Structure formats: structure tokens, C-alpha cells
Regions:
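N-terminal signal peptide c-region/cleavage motif recognized by signal peptidases
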Residues: 13-19
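Sec-dependent N-terminal signal peptides
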Residues: 4-13
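Generic hydrophobic alpha-helical segments
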Residues: 7, 42-43, 116
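Transition segments tied to proteolytic processing and entry into folded domains
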Residues: 20-25, 31, 48, 85-87, ...
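Short N-proximal segments of mature Sec-exported proteins
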Residues: 24-77
Length: 122
């Protein structure tokens, strides 16, 4: 019995670690989160007067709605909790900034604003 306890503890720790690691997101989910992160970064830049962000149309309610709907849809479909969705969004935002990819992704994402199914089944 004494030998089983460490094995069970190791298995429990392994299961806990596995549960904390989110399943890989689909390409559709990653793009929704990537657009959400890009919209958030640009909107923040617009609020702070960043010249690069001001080159885009004003991102207001429509971009916020996209962000909320996309995050909720990905949480539901991918089984993420709030911590998981925050981590996924932060990772996408970091990647956009680290690879100077905001401009190219905005070209893809901006047309999605206002589309009936752009972020999550309106």
C-alpha cells in the first residue's frame, strides 16, 4: 500500500498538469482569437494616440462585440475556462507584437467586422 500512494500521487499530479494544458485550438478558433487580440491591441493604441493604430478605422463597439462573441464561442467549443481563454488571447497578442504582425492580420480581420457570422453566429 505504501508503494501505491506515491504512484497515485504521481498520476494525480500528471492528470492535473494535463487538465491545465488546453487541447490544441482549431485554426478557426486561433483566427478568431488572433483577430480579437489584434482588435484589442489596435483599439488600445487608438485610445493612447499611437500613430500606427490611428491609421485604422476607429474600433469601438463592433470590435468589442467581436472580441466578446469570439472569446465566448471559443470557450464553449474548446472547453476553455476563463483562465484558459485569457492565456490563449495573451499568447496571440504576444505573438502579434513579437512578430510585428498586426498590420497583416488587420487586413484579414477588419473585413470580418459587421459580417453576420464574423465572430460567432449572430
Amino acid at each position: 500500500m505504501i508503494r501505491i500512494v506515491p504512484v497515485l500521487a504521481l498520476l494525480a499530479a500528471s492528470a492535473s498538469l494535463h487538465a491545465q494544458q488546453a487541447a490544441p485550438l482549431s485554426l478557426e478558433h486561433r483566427m478568431a482569437l488572433r483577430c480579437s487580440a489584434a482588435f484589442a491591441l489596435v483599439a488600445h493604441g487608438q485610445e493612447t494616440g499611437a500613430a500606427a493604430a490611428l491609421a485604422y478605422p476607429p474600433l469601438g463597439g463592433e470590435a468589442r462585440e467581436y472580441f466578446v462573441r469570439a472569446a465566448a464561442r471559443v470557450m464553449d467549443e474548446a472547453g476553455l475556462d476563463e483562465e484558459g481563454i485569457r492565456a490563449a488571447l495573451a499568447a496571440e497578442a504576444r505573438d502579434l507584437v513579437d512578430h510585428d504582425s498586426i498590420e497583416p492580420i488587420m487586413q484579414v480581420c477588419l473585413p470580418q467586422l459587421g459580417e453576420p457570422d464574423s465572430a460567432g453566429h449572430r
